[in-house]
């Protein structure tokens, strides 16, 4: 199958009721191809944004997924040392203010088990490796491990934003470096409006225990909460298939404020199924 992918990471700070700031990196675009046999897929991507000299040359995303009827697995990493664009702060919106004082490195491993594997197929709506003949849903549970390192240098913010920040945050450095171990739980549903069509929705929460540094010199335990929403649509005709998926991950970090750190990924795929034997 061939694939086109667009992704972006974002951060939202909620300092208090009157001080909120949002930032997002430019979307990174790539095209690639996969060869999939049963639950294993091998592929290669070409970064279009890098070839065309886009702003996001220092961004990278790596993602490997495994699917079967009963379980799915995922290994991923996200790196951004290229900065972001501040899109809003206070009552000002639709901004385009460069901010280079950020560095983030995140990687993780996840395994998810589907409670109703005989009637519900995760692959039908998200990897297009199987067919869903009737509408059906399933609860899901899993385990998640994540290494998260994020650094914000607020002294690099534009002067007008530094003056707007609460006094204790002006010129501050916000840094977190640790690991998260969590248990995931959620529900997925595939709707089959007519033969050959599948629309899938998944929602999960991942409460996690974090051990690491958060603006201190000593490691501490803290609580983290991750949220995930996946939406997919697939069309199948004989051995041909095409579809689109949209996935969003958001992690909530609490430290005298709330930081929402997340990723948006949109993919379009098309391909042909064949039998080796």
Show where each model-derived region lies:
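Surface-exposed strand-loop-strand hairpins of Gram-negative outer-membrane beta-barrel proteins
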Residues: 7-30, 41-55
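Outer-envelope beta-barrel architecture signal
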Residues: 29, 38-40, 60, 69-73, ...
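Predominantly the C-terminal beta-signal and adjacent terminal strand-loop region
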Residues: 228-277
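Transmembrane beta-strands of outer-membrane beta-barrel pores
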Residues: 4-10, 37-41, 46-50, 68-70, ...
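Outer-membrane pore/translocation modules
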Residues: 63-176, 247
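Outer-membrane beta-barrel transmembrane domain signature
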Residues: 8, 148-230, 234-239, 250
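Residues on the lipid-exposed face of transmembrane beta-strands in outer-membrane beta-barrel proteins
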Residues: 31-37, 62-68, 109-115, 141-145, ...
């Amino acid at each position: 199958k061939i694939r086109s992918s667009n992704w972006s990471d974002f951060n939202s700070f909620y300092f208090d009721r009157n001080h909120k700031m949002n930032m997002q990196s430019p979307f990174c675009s790539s095209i690639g191809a996969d060869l999939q046999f049963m639950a294993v897929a091998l592929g290669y991507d070409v970064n279009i944004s890098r070839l065309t000299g886009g702003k996001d040359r220092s961004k990278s995303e790596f993602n490997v997924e495994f699917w079967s009827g009963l379980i799915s697995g995922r290994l991923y990493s996200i790196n951004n040392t290229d900065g972001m664009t501040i899109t809003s702060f206070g009552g000002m919106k639709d901004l385009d203010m460069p901010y280079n004082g950020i560095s983030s490195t995140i990687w993780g491993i996840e395994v998810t088990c589907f409670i109703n594997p005989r009637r519900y197929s995760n692959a039908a709506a998200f990897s297009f490796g199987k067919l869903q003949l009737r509408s059906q849903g399933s609860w899901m549970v899993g385990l998640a491990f994540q290494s998260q390192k994020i650094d914000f240098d607020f002294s690099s913010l534009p002067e007008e934003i530094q003056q707007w920040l609460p006094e204790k945050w002006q010129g501050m450095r916000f840094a977190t470096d640790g690991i998260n171990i969590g248990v995931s739980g959620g529900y997925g549903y595939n709707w089959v409006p007519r033969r050959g069509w599948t629309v899938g929705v998944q929602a999960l929460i991942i409460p996690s225990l974090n051990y690491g540094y958060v603006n201190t010199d000593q490691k501490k335990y803290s609580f983290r909460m991750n949220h995930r929403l996946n939406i997919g649509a697939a069309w199948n005709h004989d051995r041909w298939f095409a579809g689109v998926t949209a996935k969003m991950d958001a992690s909530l970090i609490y430290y005298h404020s709330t930081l929402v750190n997340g990723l948006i990924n949109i993919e379009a795929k098309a391909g042909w199924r064949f039998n080796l034997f």
